[in-house]
Amino acid sequence: MESKKLIPEEVHTSVLLNEVIEWLAPKPGGRYLDGTLGMAGHSSAILKIAGEGAELAGLDRDEQALELAGERLAPFGDRAHRFHLAFSKFEAALDELGWDTVDGVVLDLGVSSLHLDHAERGFSFIKDGPLDMRMDPAGGMPPASSIVNKGSYSDLNRILKLYGEEPLASKITKAIIAAREEEKITTTLQLASIVEKAYPAKRRALSRTHPATKTFQGLRIAVNSELEELKTFLDRIPERLSPGARVAIISFHSLEDRIVKKTFKAQSQSCDCPPMQPICTCGKVKLMNVLTRKPVLPTEEEMKVNTRSRSAKLRVAERTGEDG
């Protein structure tokens, strides 16, 4: 699908915004779900394009993000509904609104600039702040500092290797454990320095990213149970989609993208019983049609304007009819 500039530049801060709007094709009277409300870039565009009668439920784990999103969504009045919820809890929001189904869904799985730009949230390895990384500090989950200072070698190594996709996971884990024996690791720059020193100088020189990038990714995913959240959402969302409703998901690393791709593919398949079997016993029903065989990538122009978009991948699937 060829990208068109549908949204004015002043709100074009969300990644792949025009592409999301094209694929979702918001319509008057539609009901939409933004599971990662953030600064409401996608949400405000959906409501603006959809026009009269359209409503949107926006979810976010971050209360600060919800407050800021409220300012951006204010012009839409009671057409915009905000909920302090993780996107895996979307059913609670729809039930509260009395919506059986929605006509379109968007998830932007990237880390918000709100988190990266505010050192006190503990997501940045460039600015010093407490080693926190919780999307919802009031949500009851332990901060990253707890994992770093109390986690076993096995747990830390698994987090960095599996979630961070860090090839030097073992070396970095050993460096973290050695450092914490000397003093507690409490700040982001303290951890970033430990990781940087664990990297061979030649590897640091050749890398285009900071040595701590993958370590911070792994810890953030673990702290916020991000992959489990995504799997839960993908498994449950088809039940709350109207026929023809589309789900647009933007991922930023291969772990997320693989989950989205694999789930969409599984949901697009029907009976997988042996061909010679006369009666279906598996009970599988085709739920979705995959619309993007390959992920939609940002344009060169967008990558120049918004460097955050460089690793973004958009995949879209559409709910089948009532009978699957």
UniProtKB/Swiss-Prot annotation:
What biological-process GO terms show up in the record? rRNA base methylation
Location in the cell reads: Cytoplasm
- Basic and acidic residues biased stretches: 315-324
| Keyword Ribosomal protein included in the entry's annotation | no
Task: Quote a single Gene Ontology cellular component term.
Answer: cytoplasm
Q: Where is this region: Disordered?
A: 301-324
Which Pfam families does the UniProt entry name for this protein?
Methyltransf_5
Q: Which UniProt keywords apply?
A: Cytoplasm, Methyltransferase, rRNA processing, S-adenosyl-L-methionine, Transferase
* Catalytic reaction annotation: cytidine(1402) in 16S rRNA + S-adenosyl-L-methionine = N(4)-methylcytidine(1402) in 16S rRNA + S-adenosyl-L-homocysteine + H(+)
Query: Which GO molecular function, any one, fits this protein according to its record?
Result: rRNA (cytosine-N4-)-methyltransferase activity
Enzyme Commission no? 2.1.1.199
Residues annotated as binding S-adenosyl-L-methionine are A40, G41, H42, D60, L94, D108, H115
**Physiological role:** Specifically methylates the N4 position of cytidine in position 1402 (C1402) of 16S rRNA.
| Record-linked HAMAP family | 16SrRNA_methyltr_H (MF_01007)
What family name appears in the similarity comment? Belongs to the methyltransferase superfamily. RsmH family.
Protein name, per record: Ribosomal RNA small subunit methyltransferase H
This protein's encoding gene? rsmH
